[in-house]
């Protein structure tokens, strides 16, 4: 298991969360004047949240593997 990748994953999660928030704010900003643009930004926000969840789930799995190795499983 690559510890550098494991150590970097929380930063990746935070970056995805920040991107999701940025897109959501843009969606709210353009909701009234450009609803199609707002919809696109909200869709992009959802994609970033999905990316965040994928990374988070993988991180949890990798940490679980470390726990198993520690416990001799």
Residue ranges of each PLM-predicted region?
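Non-heme di-metal
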Residues: 1-73
């Amino acid at each position: 298991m690559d510890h550098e990748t494991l150590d970097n994953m929380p930063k990746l999660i935070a970056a995805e969360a920040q991107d999701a928030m940025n897109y959501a704010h843009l969606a709210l900003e353009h909701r009234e004047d450009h609803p199609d643009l707002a919809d696109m930004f909200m869709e992009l926000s959802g994609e970033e949240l999905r990316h965040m969840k994928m990374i988070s789930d993988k991180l949890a799995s990798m940490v679980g593997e470390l726990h198993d190795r520690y416990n001799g499983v």
